[in-house]
């Protein structure tokens, strides 16, 4: 029995007329999100990053050489506002993890690129991040992981 089961028992006792089964699923998803986010933040913090800065650096890294994107592309990929992105970029530039340069294709535009320091850091951090994710999934065997992934993918498609 977990925390969510106790909540469901209470609702079943207080409102037996309601089918509260969906609360179990959404409650567990919400609680897992909190626990997983906490574990991810700890791993990233060990590399001097938080999830927001890691998101930007990882997006640039995933883009492939020369690891450059426009701010608009970063905003679209990370789904944050331009003001939020500007703040993130300012912090990363101050730490010498990214650099801004003029876009050669649009003189009014800017290109964001990983610096060598940023590339090295994100490579270290993503390695630790993936190792941490494997650790977080250790209680599930390969078949359970595949089944969970398939079900979550199917469910997510309803929203995206």
How should each PLM-predicted stretch be described?
Residues 18, 49-51, 114, 140:
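Alpha-helical hairpin
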């Amino acid at each position: 029995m977990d925390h969510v089961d106790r909540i469901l028992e209470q609702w079943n006792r207080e409102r037996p007329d309601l089918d509260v089964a969906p609360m179990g699923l959404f409650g567990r998803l919400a609680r897992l999100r909190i626990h997983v986010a906490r574990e991810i933040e700890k791993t990233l913090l060990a590399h001097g990053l938080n999830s927001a800065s890691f998101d930007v650096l990882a997006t640039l890294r995933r883009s492939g050489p020369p690891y450059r994107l426009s701010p608009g592309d970063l905003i679209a990929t990370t789904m944050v506002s331009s003001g939020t992105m500007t703040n993130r970029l300012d912090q990363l530039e101050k730490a010498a993890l990214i650099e801004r340069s003029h876009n050669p294709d649009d003189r009014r535009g800017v290109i964001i690129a990983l610096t060598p320091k940023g590339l090295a850091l994100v490579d270290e951090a993503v390695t630790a991040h993936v190792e941490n994710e494997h650790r977080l999934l250790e209680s599930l065997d390969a078949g359970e992981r595949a089944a969970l992934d398939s079900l979550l993918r199917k469910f997510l498609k309803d929203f995206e």
